[in-house]
Structure formats: structure tokens, C-alpha cells
């Protein structure tokens, strides 16, 4: 609370390379991954995604769901991480990946991922009902941990280094979904009784 009251901020110095950040983004914040050799650390997120696809998605409410559809849905979600759009956009993307969903079935799968706390979409922020700027009102799509996105895409640190656009989006998800869920959202909520939302103009 002292920080919000104007108190001094602690200074932490760190000099990670871009490669270090790529690794940490793909490793994620899984406690079991911390301190492990890199290969084992990266495997934690993949094991989690496999568990969601093969069993957890059906076990959450007792409804049997097709692992292939779950896999493609999570891959599409990963392709659109840190972006805004309609469910229709994601439905079209899933179709391009080789599967077709009915809208009702699709929404049930999305809801199951939310119940499992796999996804953590960030609500849109509208500063003023009469704002001159055309503010987007769609939520921003995120997984609860950015490593879920990279695992769903089958991407590793080297892949992110070779595609900085995707790296930037997943890094945004790291900042918003992973860190803020544990730290920023809680601090803001308790210290200033505020909410945590996203703001983006329709032009970009």
C-alpha cells in the first residue's frame, strides 16, 4: 500500500538476454519447473497441455470431449494470444486447422477451459462513455501462463527468437496473465480497490 501512497519503490536490477526471456516465457511460472535443467523445465508446460487435452477437459464436468478438438482449440487460442477478436474469428481459425465446430459446441469447449482456469481473458476498459476515440470493447485473450501458449503451438525459445512478432504477443501475455494474476492484480485490488483491464484503440 505504501507504494500507492507515494512511498519509495524497491529497485531490482536484472540483465537477462533476449534468449533468457524467451526461455522464461516458454518455461512459465510452474513451481516444479523452477531450478530444473532447461529441457525438463520446458517439458512441464507440455505435460500440462497434454493433461488438459487428454483428460482434464472432460473430467472438469464429466462431459466427454474430443481431444483433437481440444488440441486445435488451444492451438488457435495460442495463435491469438494477447489479441482481441470475436469467437467467430477463432471458429474460422480452427476451421483452417482442419476441424469444424458448431457454435454451441465451441462455446462449451471454451467454457470448459475457463472452468479449468486454463484461460484468463482480460476484460476491456472503457474510460468514458462519451470518449472521442473508438475504444475496443472485446476482451483480450490470454492463457493463465504464457508457456501454455508456446506448448500448444509446439514452440520453444528458439522459435520465439525467430519470430519476434509472436514473441512480443506471448511476452505481453507473460506480463499480463502470469505475473499480474499473482502480483499486480492482487496488489492493485487490495491497495487501491481498483480493477485491472485492457485498453486498445480499434486502429491498433
PLM region spans:
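A generic structural signal for secondary-structure junctions
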Residues: 1-2, 153
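Amphipathic alpha-helical "lid/sensor" segments that cap RecA-like P-loop NTPase cores
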Residues: 3-51
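Accessory nucleic acid-recognition modules appended to NTPase machines
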Residues: 34-201
Amino acid at each position: 500500500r505504501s507504494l500507492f501512497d507515494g512511498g519509495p519503490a524497491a529497485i531490482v536490477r536484472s540483465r537477462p538476454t533476449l534468449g533468457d526471456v524467451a526461455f522464461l516465457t516458454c518455461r512459465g511460472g510452474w513451481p516444479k519447473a523452477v531450478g530444473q535443467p532447461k529441457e525438463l523445465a520446458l517439458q512441464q508446460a507440455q505435460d500440462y497441455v497434454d493433461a488438459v487435452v487428454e483428460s482434464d477437459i472432460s473430467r472438469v464436468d464429466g462431459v466427454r470431449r474430443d481431444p483433437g478438438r481440444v488440441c486445435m482449440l488451444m492451438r488457435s487460442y495460442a495463435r491469438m494470444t494477447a489479441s482481441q477478436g470475436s469467437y467467430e474469428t477463432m471458429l474460422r481459425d480452427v476451421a483452417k486447422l482442419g476441424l469444424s465446430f458448431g457454435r454451441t459446441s465451441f462455446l462449451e469447449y471454451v467454457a470448459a477451459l475457463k472452468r479449468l482456469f486454463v484461460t484468463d481473458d482480460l476484460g476491456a476498459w472503457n474510460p468514458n462513455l462519451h470518449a472521442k476515440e473508438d475504444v475496443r470493447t472485446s476482451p483480450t485473450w490470454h492463457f493463465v501462463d504464457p508457456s501454455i501458449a508456446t506448448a500448444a503451438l509446439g514452440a520453444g525459445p528458439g522459435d520465439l527468437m525467430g519470430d519476434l512478432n509472436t514473441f512480443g504477443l506471448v511476452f505481453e501475455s507473460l506480463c499480463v496473465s502470469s505475473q499480474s494474476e499473482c502480483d499486480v492484480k492482487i496488489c492493485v485490488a487490495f491497495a487501491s480497490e481498483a480493477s485491472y483491464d485492457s485498453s486498445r484503440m480499434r486502429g491498433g
